[in-house]
Structure formats: C-alpha cells, structure tokens
A protein has these predicted regions:
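Conserved catalytic cores of phosphodiester-cleaving nucleases, focusing on short active-site segments
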Residues: 37-59, 75
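Domain-level recognition of nuclease-like catalytic cores that cleave nucleotide substrates
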Residues: 85-109
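Mg2+/Mn2+-dependent nuclease catalytic core
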Residues: 56-76, 85
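Acidic-basic catalytic patches of nuclease active cores, encompassing PD-(D/E)XK
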Residues: 1-28
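Basic, glycine-rich
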Residues: 6, 21, 31, 100-105, ...
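Active-site metal-binding core of divalent-cation-utilizing nuclease and nuclease-like domains
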Residues: 20, 24-47
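Structural motif
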Residues: 34, 47-49, 92, 102
Length: 109
C-alpha cells in the first residue's frame, strides 16, 4: 500500500474514532508551507492538535518514533497560527500523537 494511502487511512480512522467520542473535527490536513497538522478537533473548551502516524511494517520504524522535536516545534507554531486565525486563543490546547500500527492486525487472527 502506498504511503499516502496508508496515511489517509490512519487519519480517517482517527477522525472516526474522535467523532464516535463526540469530538468535532474542525480540520484535516491543515497546512502552511512549513508544516501540516493532520487533524484539529474540538471537544468542550479544548482544541486538540493531532499528528497521526500509521505504519504497515516496522521497516521504517515504529509509528511512535516518527515525530522528532523539530516537527513538534513546526506543529506548535502552526497551531498558534490556527488559533489566532480562528479566534480560538481563549481555548485550552492539547497536542497528541495517534499511532496506528497496521502490521499488528495481520497477526490478530
């Protein structure tokens, strides 16, 4: 499966999970020229910025290892822009990394 399709699948799974738990998904793939935030969701008075990492194998490393500090900093700066542009600076903010390791599913049955 292509990396882009794998990533899209993980993001869709994440959005479905969030919606089932009464989150409002505000954005998917919000970006500027320096960074991208996979999912931005709102629940109550908290805005959640979510990086989704999906893997089909461990060849490229585990999904949880794929968000270096430099990327975290770019996401944080883009989140600040998003909050200001959308008049959400009064909201609480949380950052999350959702990891989906699809290769584990192969061995579930």
């Amino acid at each position: 499966m292509e990396n882009k399709k794998i990533g899209s699948l993980g993001e869709e799974m994440t959005c479905s999970y969030l919606k089932d738990r009464k989150f409002v998904v505000l954005e998917q793939n919000y970006r500027n020229r320096y960074a991208e935030i996979d999912v931005i969701a709102l629940k109550g008075d908290t805005v959640h910025f979510i990086e989704v990492k999906t893997r089909c194998s461990e060849v490229a490393g585990r999904a949880s290892e794929a968000v270096p500090v430099s990327k975290q900093n770019r996401i944080r700066r883009l989140a600040e822009i998003y909050l200001a542009d959308n008049d959400l600076c009064d909201k609480h903010v949380e950052f999350h990394v959702v990891t989906i390791d699809l290769h584990d599913i192969n061995y579930a049955f």
